[in-house]
Amino acid sequence: MKKVSRRALFALALAIVLAAGTLAFCVKYAVNANKWVTFSGSPHVYTGTNLTGGKIYDRTGARILNTTDGRVYSSDAAVRAATVHLLGDRYGYISAPLLGNFAEQMIGYDKITGLSEASKGTASARLTISADVQKAALQALGSYHGTVGVYNYKTGEILCAVTSPSYDPDNIPDIAGDETGDYDGVYLNRFFDAAYTPGSIFKLVTSAAALEADAASKDQTYTCTGETIIGGQEIICMGEHGTLSMTQALAHSCNVYYGELAAALGKDKLQAAADRLGLNGTLRCDGYTARSTVDLSDADEGSVAWAGIGQYTDQVTALQFLRFMGVIAGGGEAAEPYLMQKISRAGQTVYEAKTETTGQLLSAATATTLGGMMRSAVVNQYGAWQFGALT
């Protein structure tokens, strides 16, 4: 009898272990099945390092990539070079997080039916970018290393996200043998992945921080004699601007003014503004993760002054600063940026972007004031004529 009881208990324990294992697998399947199927090493989904998923179009319907059989890029060499940092190359030197992020929709995967949807036709994806705008932006950059980004702050659509230097994926130059420096950092997507010392554009963040904290108005004045000492550190300006208001200081990009303003504001309020505006942390956008850093935790008074001018250890991505510009334009809030507009298969929409907003990051009054200050800088300092129809 005891032997039967022991066997029964053993069988029960085994059944419990089996049930627990099955449950654990089901949970893992529910959570991770899409990742298993779209894993970059899967021969069912990838050819080499490239997703085999369909056709990619720009916002106008111009086809810029066909991945149904290898990789067929645009017939326009300039468009190929202008979009390779978004679409990736054939060898994985330039990755395509955008396509990887939507691999599940592109290949037709479903947790219930698996890859059966893949047999129902090729996926078509429409991006928010304009191939023509990408091409024009890359041509305008010329030999400069950098990025150009344009987005609709009302909808979130990224119209342009181009990186220079670049290359034609159908005619790859001898990058490894280049000794001119022309291709330095060519594999880097400078719009999403590169964080830059922002310099004087950060003065808008300092202005926003001061206005929001009621620490200063746009009429607050400081006197610039070309240099000053703050916290034992010398702050040098490009000229002797005399007594300036905040509006005038932004137009003249006065380092002395903004050093004094940042020091008076203090590191806690400047840090809080950078945090709130999304300039100290990450921003995820359709597979990309942009990272900016404004860390004043160890900053003394002089370092805070330099941080307010966009120096010290400030590092900001183009995407995150562009979003901040959208917040100003949108009266204190803006749409979150995105790249993928729509994915369809066999006449059915399997993904469509929805506009999401940042929430109110600035008061409407502060946003209006900042917009007016920026407009004043264009009209009174740089000249509206230089910006053509944009003004």
How would you label these PLM feature ranges?
Residues 1-176, 186, 195, 268-276:
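Periplasmic/cell-envelope proteins involved in peptidoglycan metabolism and beta-lactam response
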Residues 60, 154-199, 205-391:
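Beta-lactam-recognizing serine transpeptidase/beta-lactamase-like catalytic domain environment
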